[in-house]
Amino acid sequence: MKINGSYKLPADPETVWSVLLDPDALAKSIPGAKSFAPEGDDAYTVDLSVSVATIRGDYSGRVVVADQQPRSSFKLIVEGKGAKGALSGSALFTLSQVKPGETVVSVEGEGEIAGLFARVGQRMLGGVAKLLMKQFFGNMKKQVQASVKAAAAD
């Protein structure tokens, strides 16, 4: 399944970069995340709950940030397993300043889901992936706005 999209965030690339890679901001932004903990450099363990149609699944997995080009791009690699299947994927996040105080984050990647979710919700998975990305960046926008506000108060 292809994963792609572009999302505007209200800050310069340096601020967006630091918030996107901040463990606390990630924990607050990942839809369905129940826990998100560092596991060494640029790696995290995550427990999350995902719903597709009427099926809900809990997954435990790992998130790795790789191929970092500071304030420009990075790759996010995700793996998870649960009682109802497994999920994996990777995506390249590219940051571009479109005007002062505004950064576009473009996401290009692929994901796979195996097990019950894949069998029951195959037709819906693309839509679900887009919805989850929209939720993630909506949550991340709030984290970026809080960071900008905190910096202005200093």
Where are the language model's segments positioned?
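Hydrophobic ligand-binding cavity/cleft-lining segments
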Residues: M1-S51, A146, A153-D154
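Intrinsic-disorder/low-complexity, polar/charged segments enriched in Ser/Thr/Lys/Arg/Asp/Glu/Gln
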Residues: K2-K8, A43-T45, D58-S60, S73, ...
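Hydrophobic/aromatic beta-strand elements that line small-molecule binding cavities or substrate pockets
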Residues: G5, K34, G61-D67, V78, ...
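Short strand-connecting beta-turns/loops that link adjacent beta-strands
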Residues: D12, D41, P70-R71, V98-G101
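Hydrophobic pocket/interface hotspot
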Residues: V16, L20, L26, V65, ...
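Glycine-rich portal/gate segments that line the openings of hydrophobic small-molecule binding cavities
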Residues: A37-E79, Q135
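Beta-strand/loop substructures that line and gate deep hydrophobic ligand-binding cavities in soluble
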Residues: E79-G127
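A conserved amphipathic terminal alpha-helix motif
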Residues: L116-D154
